[in-house]
Design a protein with these regions (language model features):
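Bacterial N-terminal signal peptides that target proteins for export
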Residues: 7, 11, 31-42
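Short hydrophobic targeting helices and cationic amphipathic motifs
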Residues: 4-6, 15
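C-terminal cap/substrate-recognition subdomain and adjoining C-terminal extension
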Residues: 212-304
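Alpha-helical substrate-recognition element adjacent to the catalytic core
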Residues: 62-63, 86, 114-119, 146-241
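Bacterial Sec-dependent signal peptides at the C-terminal "C-region" and cleavage site
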Residues: 50-58
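Bacterial N-terminal signal peptides
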Residues: 42-51
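Beta-strand-enriched, solvent-exposed domains that form extended recognition/catalytic surfaces
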Residues: 57-157
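Hydrophobic alpha-helical signal peptides and transmembrane signal-/tail-anchor segments
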Residues: 13-28
Length: 304
């Protein structure tokens, strides 16, 4: 019994130490649990915030585009501008936004975009000219977007016209290098006589029709080709023939000759008893029977 009483203080101390270790372990585990929970919360919060920011940035991708227009003196031209918003899945029009048309730096017309994002702006020129113009979002617009530009061709309907397939101007569609002498020879044809239409086949990978129009315009400018009216068409074999009929029906009946590279382009003219020149010389058997063939652009004028 005396031994027990002697050991009691030691036993009590041991239990106190054991209890302290237990309490410390419990507190440490609870503390770590809280820290991990908070870390997880902040991680989730960070991911959600980043996703929201990226989503907002994506929603803010807005484009304003426009393409060339064609009219005659004292006749109103309808210029179509399109305001779109590109999301992760689709591109949609933005309606209810004011759009301004600028000619020579001055606001010439205003219009609101419809539900499809299109705004129709009217402009009338009194004289024959090739008029560069710009469209932009109006001062009261809720969006911030870069300006877009194109050309308005104002031509007399009695003036001779020619159509040129863009592919006939390039050595290689991939490299985008111009055919030798093409710019100089086309410049001679258009300086005093022809008004020129450039016909471009729409490549969906290159963007919308308006974007392809802008790319073609910039390439022609960079390569010093004469300014003309640009038409963007689908790659279907009947696309140019249908457009040719539309132009004739609209009064542009002086369009009687085309210079192109593809068989489909040449046939569209020949089927309507019009003239077609193919350049460069196609492979044997590829040229339609009545098509004229030029080996290079220096020979084109001789065939017209």
């Amino acid at each position: 019994l005396r031994c027990f009483h002697r050991l009691r203080p030691c036993w009590t101390g041991f239990l106190s130490i054991l209890f302290g270790v237990f309490i410390f372990s419990y507190v440490a585990v609870r503390l770590m649990s809280i820290l991990f929970r908070r870390a997880g919360f902040f991680t989730i919060l960070f991911i959600w915030t980043a996703t929201t920011i990226l989503s907002a940035a994506e929603k803010a991708t807005v484009n304003l585009t426009v393409h060339d227009s064609l009219t005659s003196p004292n006749q109103p031209a309808t210029i179509k501008a399109t305001l779109t918003q590109k999301g992760s899945r689709a591109e949609t029009g933005i309606g209810g936004e004011p759009i301004e048309l600028l000619v020579a730096g001055q606001v010439a017309a205003t219009a609101m975009t419809g539900g499809d994002g299109r705004a129709l702006l009217s402009y009338t020129s009194k004289a024959k000219a090739m008029i560069p113009f710009t469209v932009r979002a109006g001062a009261a617009s809720n969006v911030q977007v870069a300006e877009a530009g194109a050309n308005l061709a104002v031509w007399e309907r009695r003036s001779p016209m020619m159509a040129v397939e863009m592919a006939a101007l390039m050595e290689d569609a991939e490299g985008r290098r111009p055919m030798p002498d093409a710019a100089a020879e086309l410049g001679k044809l258009t300086q005093f006589y022809y008004n020129v239409l450039y016909v471009v086949t729409h490549d969906k990978a290159a963007g919308t029709n308006d974007q392809v129009n802008a790319q073609a315009r910039q390439w022609l400018k960079d390569q010093k080709f004469p300014v003309g009216h640009i038409i963007v068409l689908s790659s279907g074999p009947e696309a140019w023939g249908t457009k040719l009929d539309e132009l004739h029906a609209a009064g542009w009946k002086t369009l009687k000759i085309g210079v192109g590279r593809t068989k489909a382009f040449a046939e569209a003219f020949l089927q309507r008893r019009l003239d077609a020149v193919m350049v460069p010389e196609p492979a044997k058997g590829e040229a339609p029977r009545k098509a004229k063939v030029a080996k290079e652009w220096k020979d084109v004028r001789k065939k017209m």
